[in-house]
Amino acid sequence: MKKTVLRAYARLIAEVGARVQKGQDVVIEAELDQPEFVTMVADACYHAGARKVTVTWKHQALEKLAIRRESVKTLQTVEDWERAKLQHYVDTLPCRIYLLSEDPDGLRGVSPAKMASARQGRYSVIKPYRDQMEGRYQWCIAAVPGVAWAKKVFPNETKARAVEKLWEAILHTCRVHDDPIAAWDAHNADLQARCDYLNSLGIETLEYRASNGTHLTVGMIPEAQFCGGGEYTIGGSYFNPNLPTEECFISPKRGEAEGIVYSSKPLSYQGQLIEDFSIRFERGRAVEAHARTNEALLQKLIAMDDGAAYLGECALVPYDSPINQTGILFYNTLFDENACCHLALGMGFIDTIRDYPNRSLEEMRALGVNDSMIHEDFMIGTPDLAITAHCRDGRSVPVFRDGTWAF
């Protein structure tokens, strides 16, 4: 891949994704196999005005080794130096950039129960720090092809060609062409216009129907609003948290989901694929879950904590989105969630609540924003998906027909 194109992508991440501000610190998190592109992103951050750029390197093989060799108690422990680093982030609010390149199968073979226990133990310590930073800093998740990931997506290609093809797909879906920054300005404007229309309807419930058996009704929080594309921090900095993105999303009301929904794409979770699954909801809670493969893993996901069985997101994405048009299953939620409509189990987004900077976390939980240690997207979009908005004034308005926007 031409370095000029990669530098344009790095600039997009720094200036449109994270929207680095002059004098701001930046923390980049990436795998060890990406030193060249990480250097490009760091350089782009400095050009955008960053005061300091720090890189946190990860290595999936070491993570797998630790899960296998360390005790659950050790894995759950948040060391004093980790707490100090988290407090430093609370105090300084650095911009965060996450570059994904991991092998989708990289954690295969480790105990899902052990991973879940480790995560649960750490979450209780980390959550207060996370809550203090909520909505106060910019962050961006973007992707870089790793060899194992590329071979998973393109198994019949050589390693070099698989990486090249994955680069091409990433750059295409992220609109990295003649003028990517202008393209993203236009894309954000289109998503915002759709959100504005949806927010004007006064939606009480969304009703999903598809020929695969999906029939689900989800309640909306009156104070919630659809968001899409870029978003603002409490301090007013505009950024794009996901590159790419095609969704208009909202956090539904905890306790108000009735019916059944069927997946339309596999869910890659903990190095394994959960395929052809369905989830049935009663009073908002997932009460039944079945899958053709890895049903036990799906049920373990839903039982991760109390909030994991409730919905945290409803996202509207047309079935003919640029990502779906590639015909590629990326085995990566950042991309696959933007291929078609999806729901998410677990944590809701407080920034979908109007006037959220002036509300307490407790108030937003009381409104119905779900809380959980997980947030797992799963795809439900189909070519015939119909979504109807039932509004508080009694109207029923088509939102999706035949898998795409009805307006």
Predicted regions mapped to residue ranges:
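Generic recognition of flexible, low-complexity loop/linker segments
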Residues: 14-16, 194-195, 204-206, 248-251, ...
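Long, well-ordered mid-to-C-terminal structural blocks that present hydrophobic/aromatic surfaces
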Residues: 250-306
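Extended hydrophobic packing segments that form well-structured cores
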Residues: 362-407
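Active-site bordering "gate/hinge" segments
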Residues: 1-258, 389, 395-398, 405-407
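Short solvent-exposed loop/turn micro-motifs enriched in small/polar/acidic residues
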Residues: 11, 199-201, 270-272, 307, ...
